[in-house]
Amino acid sequence: MKVYVVITSYQHGLGEAVETDAEVFDTIDKARKAIERKGLKTLESYKQALDCDDFQISVSGSFYHISDNEGETWDNFDIVEQEIN
């Protein structure tokens, strides 16, 4: 059986600890919806916190990355496929 793990990692400020979290989904579609939802929510937070549109976004089918232009604050959402028995 395959499961899809959404791994969230982020650093909010240069020198701060990198935080991680993971969620497991039974379909790739659910995992993709999760990273899209998380990415859009994070993007809104960036707009409010940074009070500008000065950030970078990279998106693919299994990856969502958002960061400020200095790279001091960033959020990643990745999907990893895992086979379990």
Residue ranges and their predicted role:
Residues V3-V6, V24-F25, I35, E44, ...:
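Generic hydrophobic secondary-structure signal
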Residues M1-D21, K38, G61, I79:
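Short aromatic-glycine-(Arg/Gly/Cys) micro-motifs in beta-strand/loop hairpins
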